[in-house]
Amino acid sequence: LASNLMKFIYYILRYLQTIMSKTKPSIPKGMRDFNSNVMFRRNYIFETVKTAFECYGYAPIETPAMENIQTLTGKYGDEGDRLIFKVLNSGDFLSKVNIDKDTDSKNLTKSIVEKALRYDLTVPFARFVAQNRNDITFPYKRYQMQNVWRADRPQKGRFREFFQCDADVIGTDSLLCEVELIQLYDEVFTKLKIPNVTIAINNRKILSCMVELMDAESLFDDIVIILDKIDKIGIEKVKNEIEILGVDKSSLSILDSFLNAKSIDDLSTLLNKSEVGSKGLQELKFIFDNISKLGLQSACLSLDVSLARGLNYYTGCILEVKANDVVIGSIGGGGRYDNLTSIF
């Protein structure tokens, strides 16, 4: 009897050990599974976007999920660089680390990381163009539809892995590119029957002029990153954070003047003494005039001087798209980046 009891206890313990050793099925935070019903809908959206891209003459490319770390860093600002998913070197990489020398995190990262998951599709595209420039006919219109990864804090509408659908033109400085991309947005949302869409537009040159008038040119990147958070934290907290940077409180009235501008005419009185600001204003006027002549099917183009988009590589007009009937933040964005390929 004692022998049988011991066997019973033994098998019970083995069974419990087996149950406890099994891994609970889960996925990392900020990542998602998609069942078949969702995939049918996603594929319909992707096919609609793809068809619109090709109707406008854009050709497809793909780039690797991983890029060399130096390709990605330094393009998105300090905050963006922190959100890059870094990939540890394979093999016994720690054996090559000098613990006495590599004491801070930046030096340690250089020793153990050579690759990273792509943060967006724009910088890999710039790398692709620089690497294949002898085989490309310019102007070059490309589209790319692939996953990107960001080491962000997961929250509603914000994930660590998500899909981007990009269309870019490279090799021309014509502002008709911006006009066409606004029409392309309008085409896609009309085909998808998404109503009440606003395409907000601003220009980095106008932001540059604003910061210049605030006597804070050296803080431009920091101010733009803070301004990019205005929808999340509100204007008063934006002002507080800018003041903490060292901007004189009296200069914040200039910020108010710009944010209160609702039209090209409002801006012209603020920018008439600035060469850079006037150029940005001319670019915006060209785009508004042409969109007014061509018309949009369902979207609305609107000036938003608070629009900053905190990516370092933008040089001209910037865009952000919102579906006003849904509270999920922006559903699209972009802008002009004239000098990005020159870094490669």
Task: Label the model's feature ranges.
Residues 21, 41-56, 67-70, 103-112, ...:
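Positively charged, Gly/Ser-enriched RNA/tRNA-binding surfaces
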Residues 33, 212-217:
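Phosphate-rich ligand and nucleic-acid binding surfaces
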Residues 82-94, 216-237, 323:
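Acidic, His- and aromatic-enriched active-site or binding-groove loops in soluble protein domains
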